């Protein structure tokens, strides 16, 4: 039996990050956590693409996939529940959009888009009290790049 495990050390990987600027107080922290994690593994080929909001993340991710320059793409954002159905529509469509791209792609795409009930939860998940989801999602991306390289 063979077992394959993703490693964090993926030499010379080129990473694309797509981040929504809406809820920028939170998303700046997510980007910082992600880029600091990638820097720990000496990954310097990191490009960050800012989009207005979470809804635009799947489109920009699709554009980056078409460029065929990256070994993996990390998506970051923060959707915070309000008083209307807008939250549910955005969350469902963005998650579906990113998942559909991931399934059709030959490179991994990780989902670091927070969906929270309030700003306090979002700040906690961006590293205020616990781990930074940007960093955690970056680690997941490195593992998936490693696994992808092992099977291809």
Curated annotation (Swiss-Prot):
Which UniProt key words apply to this protein? Riboflavin biosynthesis, Transferase
Tell me the active site: 86 (proton donor)
* Protein residues bound to 5-amino-6-(D-ribitylamino)uracil: 22, 54-56, 78-80, 111
Q: Which gene encodes it?
A: ribH
Source species taxonomy: Bacteria, Bacillati, Bacillota, Bacilli, Lactobacillales
Organism the protein comes from: Limosilactobacillus reuteri (strain DSM 20016) (Lactobacillus reuteri)
Q: Which InterPro entries match?
A: LS, LS/RS, LS/RS_sf
Q: Which GO terms describe its cellular component?
A: cytosol; riboflavin synthase complex
What this protein is reported to do is described as: Catalyzes the formation of 6,7-dimethyl-8-ribityllumazine by condensation of 5-amino-6-(D-ribitylamino)uracil with 3,4-dihydroxy-2-butanone 4-phosphate. This is the penultimate step in the biosynthesis of riboflavin.
Molecular-function annotations in GO: 6,7-dimethyl-8-ribityllumazine synthase activity
* Enzyme Commission number(s) of this protein: 2.5.1.78
The UniProt family comment states: Belongs to the DMRL synthase family.
Top EC group: transferase
Recorded catalytic reaction(s): these are: (2S)-2-hydroxy-3-oxobutyl phosphate + 5-amino-6-(D-ribitylamino)uracil = 6,7-dimethyl-8-(1-D-ribityl)lumazine + phosphate + 2 H2O + H(+)
Question: Per its record, how is this protein called by name?
Answer: 6,7-dimethyl-8-ribityllumazine synthase
Which residues hold (2S)-2-hydroxy-3-oxobutyl phosphate?
Answer: 83-84, 125
Provide the disulphide bond pattern: none
């Amino acid at each position: 039996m063979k077992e394959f495990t993703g490693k964090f050390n993926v030499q010379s990987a080129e990473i694309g990050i797509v981040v929504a600027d809406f809820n920028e107080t939170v998303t700046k922290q997510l980007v910082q956590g992600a880029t600091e994690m990638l820097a720990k593994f000496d990954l310097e080929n990191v490009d960050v693409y800012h989009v207005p909001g979470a809804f635009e993340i799947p489109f920009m991710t699709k554009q980056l996939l078409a460029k065929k320059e990256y070994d993996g793409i990390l998506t970051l954002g923060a959707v915070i529940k309000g008083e209307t159905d807008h939250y549910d529509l955005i969350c469902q469509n963005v998650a579906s959009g990113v998942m559909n791209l991931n399934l059709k792609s030959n490179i991994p795409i990780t989902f670091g888009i927070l969906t929270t009930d309030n700003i306090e939860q979002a700040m906690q998940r961006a590293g205020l009290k616990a781990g930074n989801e940007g960093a955690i999602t970056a680690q997941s991306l490195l593992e998936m790049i490693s696994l992808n390289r092992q099977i291809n």
